[in-house]
Amino acid sequence: MVRLMIQDRLMTAGMGGPLSEQVDPASLHHVLDIGCGPGGWILEAARLYPHMELTGIDISWRMIEYARAEAQARRLTDGVEFLVMDALRPLDLPGDSFDLVNLRFGSSFLLVTDWPRLLGELLRVTRPGGIVRVTDGMTTQSNSPAYDRLFQMFLCALYRSGHSLTEEKAGVTHELDRLLSETGCQQVQTKAYMLEFVAGTVGGKNFYEDSRFGFQTILPFLQKMGCASEDYDALYEQAMIELQQPDFRVIWPMVTAWGTKPA
């Protein structure tokens, strides 16, 4: 939970806000977030765009309860709804309902073979003329040799588990525009972001915390896929040292792809 909240802050701030590429957020009134986790994206959108009615769905009761509590604590409950729902099954939502449907980091829970079906569901619940928006990350580039080795193990596990098309690139990020077009979206566009995190800054500290939690949490997954090296623990400790060096920096490329549903 802590890691997801940290990661959410990293992404949203680094990309300039929850909908920075959209020309006219004021025209978006009904918005759906798929796999909302602890609700960070929804709550930031609610803060910036109080006219919106926002719905977040996630398979985890724990995530949804946390998101609801956060909405209460931040006094953002008006127009905000969080529902328990499995995105890998047909969505229990009416068709043609949302002005924008958002999905971030889908590769974390979608197999490569799952993408066409889910994107079809996103298109179904989007109103004619509405937007399907997908964001995912690419391979990080850092000056920490230990961190880079850990990340390569993560890429290995994503590929072997069926979440990536290749072992060199994370997920299906480089294919998002094609997938949207093949689903039936029109006017598909993409925007690339280069999120840079530097030691001694708030972003650098958040990246360190995200990495510290993340590489602890995913170790069983790496081991199951046969991608964790025997020196993993020592490598992890070395990476945490390198991430706190004054000259540490990392670039985390992101891509947002979006398209409209035919009228």
Describe the function of each predicted region:
Residues 3-30, 44, 48:
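Conserved alpha-helix/loop element of class I SAM-dependent methyltransferases that forms part
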Residues 91-100:
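A short acidic, Gly/Pro-enriched loop at the edge of an enzyme's catalytic core
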Residues 30-34, 38-90:
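Class I SAM-dependent methyltransferase SAM/SAH-binding core
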